[in-house]
Amino acid sequence: MLNLMPVAWPINTSGMSVKIVDASIHEIQLKTRMPFKYGIATMTEVPMVFVTVEAEVDGKTATGTSSDLLPPKWFTKVPDDPIEKEIADMLRVIRRALGQALGQVGDSAFDLWRILYEKQAEWAESSQVPPLLAHFGTSLVERALIEATCRANNQALGQAITTGLLGFDPGDVHPILKGQAASSLLPSQPLAKVQARHTVGLGDPLSANQITEDDRIDDSLPQSLDQCIKAYGLRHFKIKINGDIQWDLERLKSVAKTIVQHAAGDYAFSLDGNEQFQSITSFRDHWNQLRNEPELDSFFEHLLFIEQPLHRDVALDEALKTEFDQWPDRPAVIIDESDATLESLPKALAIGYAGTSHKNCKGIFKGIANACLLEHHRRNGNHTVMSGEDLCNVGPVAVIQDLAIMAMLGIESVERNGHHYMAGLSQFPHRTQEQILEAHDGLYKTSPLGWPTLAITNGEIDLSSVNKQAFGTGFDLDLGVFDEISMSEE
């Protein structure tokens, strides 16, 4: 457990140096407890990788670990690409980023990230690798580096940003913020709790009586939407649509009926457009048909925002500004997959979007800078949205680091689905399970079958243990129980 020490503010990072001296990649194969259908993909099994770096931070040596699943059909959306190729492509960008980072020296973690980001971007452009995919690799190195820096100085993430330990400068990412300190644009304290915004996947059963005997799961966790609402006290939801108006209408009416019947009256939801539309005009027509359905009239009063309705190939076309301008009473629409580079959010705001999502796989410093930019625009009278979205995050590392950044950014409604599509930490070694329960009592609880599962009470996740950690697990993860894989790009 990290023993946080009081720190004077601000820290002077001049003369400081950060260097990555060693790294490794480990892997474990996981299976979902039920199929996760999102967009054009259905996830049933998936690799999880752990990236560990050893860093010299101002003369002190520390390690940091990051982790993520390798999800098909998200970083790239090529229907015909085999899953094996997509996994190989994801491993390629991770290996490339680590190769770029090894031996690299920066004045701070932020400075080193900037160097790595530019190198990875140059390589990606010359190799025709999409930036969203390329910087997945950057983000894994970045996360491990941030944890190492925080651990070397006994600071939690929020402290490390506001004290200047990480060297973060929002104006270096978004020039409009020049001269504004991150501490003046971010919450003064991390959130103690967040709302778990439950993913309603395209194929998820809505009621227990819809589950056939063959599909019924006997692992002590809820399976259908009504069971999840009762078990977790859920109040926030993320509902996926597929672009077919008749299917979406019937699905939304069924989802709405289930939520209204079982959830508290202060429920709220977002819609995920899953990149199903090619223009704002076509999405607006779809939206109007949904909105004009009498059975959904009161339900839509609880809408938070709409996420990425347009395909990434067209979503940031400047010509869309005219379509946005012609729709003054539009709901808040944000980007997600289109938020691929440092320039994506400013471009989206200029077109007419209300904001973006944060996912750790898109980058930590980028996400913090985006939060600062949105707060700047909010103070100038604009309605802005930064949402917290999930890419099936599970422990023992990924979901904790994800929650740490959400708490720091003050994002109160956070999509969570890793606990729903995976059976807690049941697939991990017993020692890893023990360490999680020891370090994160309150975040995890023991399931009736004896393994840790995310604790959600009254729809909320308690972040008390998360906010005490150096952006990580709070213990030294034993990587020897996982398979080490080569760092070579060959």
Q: What positions do the PLM features span?
A:
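Flexible C-terminal active-site loop/helix
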Residues: 10, 380-382, 388-490
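Short beta-strand elements
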Residues: 47-57, 62-68
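Metal- or metallocofactor-binding catalytic centers and their adjacent structured scaffolds
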Residues: 61-164
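Catalytic core of soluble alpha/beta enzymes
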Residues: 238-399
